[in-house]
Amino acid sequence: MYVEVLKSKIHRVTITEANLNYVGSITIDEDLMDAANIIAGEKVQIVDNNNGARLETYTIPGKRGSGVICLNGAAARIVHPGDIIIIMAYAWMPMEEAKVFKPAVVFPDTATNKIILK
């Protein structure tokens, strides 16, 4: 049996931009993506701590070291600059593997979006 489990989490990061006219997705500083083991184009779930909204989209790498977190497309109407969000990615794996699997969890500084703990 396979189960879906948390694979990656960027816990409490601040939205720096929102671009309504972009095709879609979330742009994430590539340093954060690497630290959380999230790849370009990967499906992620976004949870907005300010308004409780949840949505799914895919990732686009942003400039390394920039701290950029930009919601693009329709999501820009739901999540706004200054909001604190959690970004999560999931993976399917066999039950026995899932029991011992440890997700990559990153804790950025919400003022700079730089990694302070992982």
UniProtKB/Swiss-Prot annotation:
CDD domains: Asp_decarbox. The keyword Lyase applies. Its EC number is 4.1.1.11. GO terms for molecular function: aspartate 1-decarboxylase activity. The active site is at residues 25, 58. Substrate binds at residues 57, 73-75. Heterooctamer of four alpha and four beta subunits. Catalyzes the pyruvoyl-dependent decarboxylation of aspartate to produce beta-alanine. This is Aspartate 1-decarboxylase. It comes from Porphyromonas gingivalis (strain ATCC BAA-308 / W83). The lineage of its organism: Bacteria, Pseudomonadati, Bacteroidota, Bacteroidia, Bacteroidales.
